[in-house]
């Protein structure tokens, strides 16, 4: 091409611009001039003479860059350390700008040069600008290496000034350290930074904080020291994140943890109990945060666990009498302790599962072995009964019921939280079931929705099987409404009228803990009841063929109007037996015990409680104050002077017989009932296991049985053995006849 310029001509066009870039940057480079130079270089490289350009240009550029580096070095000698660092930073920033502009202008040359340098290597430096690389090398060899020690000392002084509270220019730190990284070889860009700065920085950091920490904790104590450490770690972390390569953070953190925390971890832990007692949540957060960095939380967990027990016991012992007598007091104390430390775990220990486990362990001991509910002689706790009574109180009508739905749900949720700590969940369930029965059949439940809510909460925690009977009880009560409506429709169709208003509960056998007591003679309902019972029995048998009704008179209730001499009418809430006794007074002013026995059919023991309760209420009177002296001729009369502030009077009250108070419906489940239920559960578990496994050794069967029933209770080995022997007698399982006793197994008999 006739218009192609030579290499010398091209250099003559570019030389002054290149010199200005490095030696007179303030002169600037216009966009127009930039494009002129770039176009000429590009056009030349597009011709056949590009190799000549490379051979000519690269050495000249290297010389120019080296000249600039020498100039910077010579000027730097006149600056002291602090001023030198600023000078170096400014020259480095200008150098970067000049190098980048030069790199872009010579990019066509670089592309050719890079293509000539290609090898089979896939390393990242294949395509690096040779021009930019040369400028970095010149800077490193001529300007950086002679000054690096002075620069590093100045940089470390900046950090020391920052640590000790003197004002300083941290941006200089960032820019200078960027230079350290940029000058590193491509294979390890951090090599120069690590060898020339980082290593010394970490050593000085360790030295600085060893001295400061020892002095500070001695003068200010642990709590102030923790706050100081917390702030120091935050400052150091922020400085690294903002001004240094992130790789330094892990190394720095290790030093800080060791010097500031590990060296004083025992002093931290020894102060933990005082902080707990003083309830300084901010200090708890700091101590947990700091000691978790050095994996020294075990002493804290142990102290925390012991503290929960001591605080709970202190609270219970200060209210011991009330806690023993009133379920709501003991449960409220336990819930208060649970809530307090559960919140502490969330807010101070980041929901740490190890602290939660420690709390569960100590709180379980507090729940089950507290002095208000634990009997050390029997080694038993009645907390399952107490918790069931607490639930009964808030779910039934009365002063303890919570009408606010949100608050009620909160209390039920808290009750289930305590429930999970019960080892004998079967005792809770048996008592809860019995109390639910009473609430439902006596119309004492405040809300069906609340009852269902509690059952669902238990179901969610313990499983569907645990609550099967409870669910069935609620279902029965719903069905009873339909049955009574249908019965009334039946009476209307037959033009029949009952002498009194009746409501019948038809309950599924097996789901309810309701059975009549065994008596020598059966109860004979009074005529006022008998016709209604007969009508309903006839209706039910026709509607539900094959079903058998058993009337539970022990649990039947009645409202009886009592008209006094002055015309005042009281509504008496009575048991069926009390109602039968009171109705006898409609025909006589006095009746003997013999007449009562003969009329209602019960023996003298069975009528004792109903009579004593009526006497205690003041409805009737007896000439013989002590029931021990009663005989067949003992007379009972209506108290014509009876009066009460309440128009509705409950006659089913507890009375003192011997050393205990009794009522017609025992509130809690007896030990015999518990043992009977457990024996049944053990049998059922063993049969299920053997039906599945077919053959098992005694030890394996014992272990598997324990596992299956453990969600209800922890069985005794003797109880399991007794259940096995019973099932052998009933021919559900049998022993093999192996000659070696240790090899004998149990076999399932289909």
Curated annotation (Swiss-Prot):
InterPro entries: Cullin, Cullin_homology, Cullin_homology_sf, Cullin_N, Cullin_neddylation_domain, Cullin_repeat-like_dom_sf, WH-like_DNA-bd_sf, WH_DNA-bd_sf. Belongs to the cullin family. There is a cross-link at residue 691 (Glycyl lysine isopeptide (Lys-Gly) (interchain with G-Cter in NEDD8)). GO terms for cellular component: cullin-RING ubiquitin ligase complex; cytoplasmic SCF ubiquitin ligase complex. Keywords: Isopeptide bond, Ubl conjugation, Ubl conjugation pathway. SUPFAM superfamilies: Cullin homology domain, Cullin repeat-like, Winged helix' DNA-binding domain. Probable core component of cullin-based SCF-like E3 ubiquitin-protein ligase complexes which mediate the ubiquitination and subsequent proteasomal degradation of target proteins. The E3 ubiquitin-protein ligase activity of the complex is dependent on the neddylation of the cullin subunit. Disulfide bonds: none annotated. It holds the Pfam family Cullin_Nedd8. It comes from the Eukaryota. This is Cullin-5.
């Amino acid at each position: 091409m006739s218009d192609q310029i030579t290499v010398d001509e091209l250099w003559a066009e570019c030389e002054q611009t290149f010199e200005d870039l490095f030696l007179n940057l303030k002169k600037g480079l216009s966009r127009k001039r930039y494009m002129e130079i770039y176009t000429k270089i590009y056009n030349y490289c597009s011709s056949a003479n590009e190799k000549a350009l490379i051979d000519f240009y690269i050495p000249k550029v290297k010389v120019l860059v080296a000249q600039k580096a020498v100039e910077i070095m010579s000027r730097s000698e006149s600056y002291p350390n602090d001023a030198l660092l600023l000078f170096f930073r400014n020259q480095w920033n200008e150098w970067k700008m000049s190098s980048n502009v030069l790199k872009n202008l010579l990019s066509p040359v670089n592309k050719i040069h890079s293509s000539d340098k290609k090898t089979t290597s896939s390393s990242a430096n294949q395509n690096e600008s040779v021009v930019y690389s040369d400028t970095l090398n010149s800077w490193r060899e001529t300007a950086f290496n002679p000054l690096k020690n002075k620069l590093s000392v100045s940089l470390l002084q900046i950090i020391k000034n920052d640590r000790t509270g003197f004002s300083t220019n941290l941006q200089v730190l960032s820019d200078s350290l960027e230079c350290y990284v940029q000058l590193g070889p491509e294979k390890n860009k951090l090599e120069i930074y690590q060898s020339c700065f980082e290593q010394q920085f970490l050593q000085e950091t360790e030295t600085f904080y060893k001295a400061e920490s020892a002095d500070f904790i001695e003068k200010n104590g642990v709590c102030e020291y923790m706050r100081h450490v917390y702030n120091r770690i935050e400052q150091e972390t922020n400085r690294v994140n903002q001004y240094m390569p992130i790789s330094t953070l892990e190394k720095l953190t290790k030093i800080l943890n060791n010097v500031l925390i590990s060296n004083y971890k025992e002093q931290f832990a020894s102060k933990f109990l005082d902080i707990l007692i003083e309830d300084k949540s901010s200090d708890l957060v700091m101590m947990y945060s700091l000691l978790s960095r050095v994996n020294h939380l075990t002493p804290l967990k142990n102290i925390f666990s012991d503290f929960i027990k001591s605080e709970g016991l202190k609270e219970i012992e200060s209210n011991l009498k009330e806690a023993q007598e009133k379920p709501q007091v003991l449960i409220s104390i336990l819930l208060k302790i649970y809530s307090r430390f559960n919140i502490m775990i969330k807010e101070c220990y980041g929901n740490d599962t190890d602290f939660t486990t420690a709390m569960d362990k100590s709180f379980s001991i507090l729940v089950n072995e507290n002095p208000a509910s634990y009997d050390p002689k029997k080694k038993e706790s009645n907390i399952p009964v107490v918790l069931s009574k607490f639930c009964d109180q808030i779910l039934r009508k009365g002063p303890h019921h919570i009408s606010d739905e949100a608050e009620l749900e909160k209390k039920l949720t808290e009750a289930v939280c305590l429930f999970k700590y019960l080892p004998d969940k079967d005792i809770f369930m048996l008592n809860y079931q019995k109390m639910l029965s009473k609430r439902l059949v006596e119309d004492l439940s405040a809300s069906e929705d609340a009852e269902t809510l509690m059952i669902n909460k238990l179901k969610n925690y313990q499983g569907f099987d645990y609550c099967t009977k409870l669910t069935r009880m609620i279902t029965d009560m719903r069905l009873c409404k339909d049955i009574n409506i249908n019965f009334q429709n039946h009476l209307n169709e037959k033009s029949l009228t009952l002498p009194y208003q009746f409501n019948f509960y038809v309950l599924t056998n097996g789901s309810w803990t309701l059975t009549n007591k065994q008596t020598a003679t059966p109860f004979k309902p009074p005529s006022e009841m008998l016709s209604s019972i007969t009508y309903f029995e006839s209706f039910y048998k026709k509607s539900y063929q094959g079903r058998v009704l058993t009337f539970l008179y022990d649990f039947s209730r009645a409202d009886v109007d009592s008209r006094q001499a002055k015309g005042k009418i009281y509504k008496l809430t009575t048991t069926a037996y009390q109602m039968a006794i009171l109705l006898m007074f409609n025909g006589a002013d006095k009746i003997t015990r013999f007449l009562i026995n003969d009329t209602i059919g019960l023996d003298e023991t069975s009528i004792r409680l109903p009579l004593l309760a009526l006497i205690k209420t003041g409805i009737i009177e007896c000439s013989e104050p002590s029931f021990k002296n009663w005989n067949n001729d003992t007379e009972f009369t209506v108290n014509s002077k009876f009066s009460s502030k309440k128009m509705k009077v409950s006659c089913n009250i507890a009375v003192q017989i011997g050393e205990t108070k009794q009522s017609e419906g025992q509130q809690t489940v007896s030990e015999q009932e518990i043992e009977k239920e457990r024996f049944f559960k053990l049998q059922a578990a063993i049969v299920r296991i053997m039906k599945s496994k077919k053959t098992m050794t005694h030890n394996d069967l014992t272990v598997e049985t324990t596992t299956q029933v453990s969600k209800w209770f922890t069985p005794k080995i003797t109880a399991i053995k007794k259940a096995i022997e019973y099932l052998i007698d009933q021919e559900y399982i049998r022993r093999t006849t192996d000659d070696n006793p240790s090899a004998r197994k149990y076999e399932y008999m289909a």
